[in-house]
Every structure is written in C-alpha cells, then in structure tokens.
Amino acid sequence: MPHQFDRREFITWMIPAGFGLCSCFGCRTTPITHRSQLLLVPESEEIQMGVASYNEVKTKNKISTNPKYNEVVGRVGQRLAEAARRQNLGTNFDWEFTVIADQTQNAFCLPGGKVAFYEGILPVCQNEAGVAVVMSHEISHALARHGGERMTQQLEVQGAGKIIQAIAQRKAPDKEQVFMSVYNTGTKYGFVLPYSRKHESEADEMGIHIMSQAGYDPNEAPKFWERFAASHSGQKPPEFQSTHPSDERRAAALRELLPQAIQEYQAAPNKYGVGVTIA
C-alpha cells in the first residue's frame, strides 16, 4: 500500500532545513519591534484555538462580581485596544475582557484579543496604569503572534529531533538515548527558554509603547515590576532556567525605554496619568 501524504509529518521533517531562513513562506515582521519571525500556523487557526480556550476558561472558572475590578479592567482594555487599532493592530480581533475570581497573580491574552485578569494581580497593579502595564504586555503577545511562533518552534524542534534520532539509529544505535538526551537538554536551555524570554522582553517593549499611546503614564511600567518582585518571597530559579526574565531585569529594561515612551504619552490624544486607584 503506497504511503499517504501527511501534511503535518512533511512539515515536521522539512522545517529544520529552514532554520534561520526568513525569505521563506510564512515569515513576517513583528509590529513595533520589527523582528523577523517564522510562522507556519495560519492566524485564523490561532484565533480559533484562542476563542475555544477562552470559552473553556470562562466555563471552568468563577467570574468576578467585583464591580470596580470589572469596570477598571474593561475600561483599560478598551483604551488599549483603541490605541492598537490606531496603529492598525488587532483590527481582526473581537476584544473581550474578563476578570476571574481567583487570587492567582496572573493575566493573559489569547489570540483574537481574549483577555483574562485574575483578581490576585489587581492589588499589585494598584491603579489603572498598573493594569495597563500588565494588559498591554499580554495583548502584545497576541498582536505579535507569539503563540503561533511557539507552535512553529515546536515543529522545528520535533523535526530536528527526528533527523538526529534517525542518524543515531543508523550510525550508533547503542547511543541513541544519549544523543536524544543531549539534544533535548540543549534545545531546552539553548533554544526554547531563551526564545521564551525573548518573547517576554518583546511584549514588555511593545506594551510600554501601547500603554503610552493609550494615555497611561509609562513611568508606572518599571514601578509595577518592582512591586511584583516585592510581592514574591522565596528563592527564585536562575534566569537561564526560567521562561521569563527576572523582574529586576524587566524593570531596568523598561526604564531604558522611558524617554521614547514618555514622548508618545505626551502626544497621546487623551492622558489619564495613573488613572483610578484600585482599593
């Protein structure tokens, strides 16, 4: 029986040949930071998965009934979405903002503009500008299509792993497990985690510009990460083992971006400063 063509298997094997090549199909440039990226997943599929995941989150979690939390998150979200639209970003997003009644210090934005804020992060935000810091970071992940880029990255790693495994099976079958262990460790610490930290830093950079253009004081960005660091106790893992840069590094990087961000804030159509304080 002839072997049937499998699109996913074909992509998985062929991607390693395209490592580092952004002249190929599926390459684009990120907004604001202008970084070249490779994307093999259509944006429509990303959005479809994002909507499905968001609906599941809302079904499985208790939605906050705190009127002030819902009002602040919704208001900040609409202002950030409008600032993004003025730059022709997220124009195909159906924005939605939900507060989850959970004390976890977390927030996220799924493809398609589906934003969730957990109640636990709001006291650290302290005010509307603090909410804007977190939310502009999260929506930047979606605007830059970091989710699609991570899916492409997984295909790259899987494809290269298959090639290495095939070579090991042919050349040194008794050492196959050793080769694969070294490969998996190398890709984790040399490729996957550094790339994840790059995404986080890029979302910070995009976010401070978006919040400034939305009329929120960008000086609050480094202050938020200093507060966030202070809210955590206990020993943290070394940065090279983490998916995120350290809070201190993020605050320092954002301070370097302040001069341009302040100019954008001063040129914003409306200025809200730090906005309403969150009790």
Briefly describe each language-model feature range.
Residues 2-279:
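A Zn2+-metalloprotease active-site environment signal
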